[in-house]
A protein has these predicted regions:
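Active-site-adjacent beta-strand/loop module that shapes the phosphate/pyrophosphate-binding cleft
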Residues: 41-49, 132-151
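Short aromatic/basic micro-patch
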Residues: 92, 142, 165
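Positively charged N-terminal leader segments that act as targeting/secretion signals
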Residues: 1-12
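Short, solvent-exposed loop/turn elements at beta->coil junctions and helix N-caps
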Residues: 29-32, 127-132
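Acidic, metal-coordinating catalytic segment for phosphate/diphosphate chemistry
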Residues: 29-66, 72
Length: 201
């Protein structure tokens, strides 16, 4: 065994004997910022290497909800809007915040109707996702909505939305060529593409 093979074997050995126990120790914490949607906490910690440091965490007070609508002809709907934190336009599936303590499916139904005017008779949870787990505890649920009926959209007054109906295959191409970068939408479209390729839809 040469040196490179030995290092590879050592890495695999370490991974096999790795435990999932929390190696971080919190020595103190301080609330830095709070509003109705997020809270920012700064922690004084002992990190996994045993050294002191700080860690900032953004806590989201609502869960993230995403809905990928898919009709009988395998068309889907994207929502276009300008995203303030990115300072750029974004194409996404219908998304929003689901208050804690409320059935996330009810939040998903509300978001779909508000943003697209669609109601769905068939709902399937297809993915759960942590959106930025190095700095935030934000957690999301993604639903696939089928058997669609069109009504009037009911957008919030802070939203300026463009709704685009397109073949799902085109939405998949938009993910592949980088036109769609929203993480929940990327995850949803790739998951549905996998389900289609495995004849599960």
């Amino acid at each position: 065994m040469n040196a490179s093979q030995f290092r590879g074997a050592f890495t695999i050995f370490n991974a096999m004997h790795h435990t999932e126990e929390n190696p971080w120790k919190i020595t103190s914490e301080k609330n830095i910022y709070d509003n109705p949607w997020i809270n920012v906490t700064e922690y004084q910690v002992i990190n996994p290497s045993g050294n002191p440091g700080i860690y900032g965490k953004v806590h989201f007070k609502n869960m993230a909800i995403g809905v990928l609508p898919l009709d009988d002809e395998l068309n889907t709907y994207l929502v276009g809007q300008f995203r303030f934190p990115l300072n750029q336009y974004s194409w996404e599936m219908p998304e929003g915040g689901g208050p804690q303590g409320i059935d996330p499916l009810e939040s998903a139904k509300r978001e779909l109707l508000e943003e697209t005017g669609l109601k769905a008779a068939q709902w399937t949870e297809i993915q759960q996702i942590h959106l930025s787990n190095s700095v935030s505890d934000e957690w999301g649920i993604i639903y696939l909505a089928r058997e669609l009926t069109q009504f009037e959209p009911e957008p919030e007054d802070t939203e300026q939305l463009i709704i685009k109906k397109l073949p799902f295959a085109e939405a998949y191409r938009m993910v592949c060529n980088g036109q769609i970068t929203d993480s929940m939408t990327v995850a949803a479209i790739l998951k549905v593409q996998l389900l289609i390729s495995e004849n599960q839809l």
